[in-house]
Design a protein with these regions (language model features):
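Composition-driven detection of intrinsically disordered, low-complexity segments
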Residues: 11, 34-37
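Extreme N-terminal basic, low-complexity initiation segments
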Residues: 1-13
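Conserved alpha/beta-domain cores
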Residues: 36-223, 229-231, 237-239, 253
Length: 257
């Protein structure tokens, strides 16, 4: 059985009164308080912004799923969000998720974990044990590996297919002109394709990429759109996002290193 190591934090941040918290090597050292950062936005404020955006778009607030992106976040911050009742989280790496979430699942019921970062083919089986949804199916080789493991064990996480809407060399995902064929291939493999995911270029207007992703999804009868992050999720909702991936706005700035 997995266990999350505990550390004693003598004084907390972001409203935390201190106490015993799970800790992860390399982010929060046992016996030390986390580094002080700018306070995150209260979760109810994020929810209010989502509600306002969905109302403006003529949609129900329940049509948008808030994924709290906890990658590289100190576990005291993650625990604080869990204590507020939120249960939908996103991680970027299988290894980090495996070091963190089995322990939290011993303490909290109903955790819904989403993989939003790149997945290596040799990590697929491990990902099946951790995640309910994989947002980053970005190439045929990975799709085939997922289908093979699903056949072996009899179940499969929901999947989103990643489209490189900006056609950037440094980003994963199929190009927009390859998306229709990739969707068809994944469906032929009997993968539970729920929608599409994109990460717009940092120096371009996000809404143009959200609109492109929505157009590709619509012509392929896909309802799910995983798009929008802390700085642009309201624009994504206006373009039809069903899953928004919000990290720093909830948890504060990440602590790398």
């Amino acid at each position: 059985m997995h266990r999350v190591a505990m550390c004693i934090v003598s004084s907390g941040i972001d409203g935390d009164a201190g106490g015993a918290w799970p800790c992860r090597a390399g982010v929060v050292k046992c016996g030390e308080a986390p580094l002080k950062q700018e306070p995150p936005m209260p979760l109810p404020d994020i929810t209010a912004r989502i509600n306002a955006s969905t109302t403006a778009a003529g949609r129900s607030p329940s049509s948008v799923h808030l994924i709290a992106v906890s990658k590289v976040q100190p576990n005291d911050r993650v625990e604080a969000v869990l204590q507020e009742g939120h249960r939908v989280f996103g991680e970027n790496r299988v290894q980090e998720a495996d070091s963190k979430w089995p322990g939290f699942r011993e303490l909290y019921d109903g955790i819904d974990l989403h993989l939003i970062g790149p997945l290596q083919s040799n990590k697929v089986r491990q990902a099946f044990d951790l995640f309910q949804t994989i947002h980053s199916v970005d190439r045929p080789k990975l799709a085939k590996a997922i289908a093979r493991i699903a056949d072996e064990i009899g179940h499969c996480p929901d999947v989103f297919l990643q489209v490189n809407t900006g056609e950037e060399d440094q980003k994963a995902g199929v190009s927009p002109d390859q998306a229709d064929a990739f969707i068809a291939e994944c469906r032929a493999l009997a993968l539970p394709v729920k929608g599409l995911m994109c990460i717009p270029p940092a120096d371009e207007e996000s809404s143009l990429h959200f609109a492109l992703l929505a157009k590709i999804a619509a012509r392929n009868d896909l309802a799910g759109l995983s798009m929008g992050m802390s700085g642009d999720f309201e624009s994504a909702i206006a373009q039809g996002a069903t899953h928004i991936r919000v990290g720093s706005a909830i948890f504060g700035e990440r602590q790398y290193g």
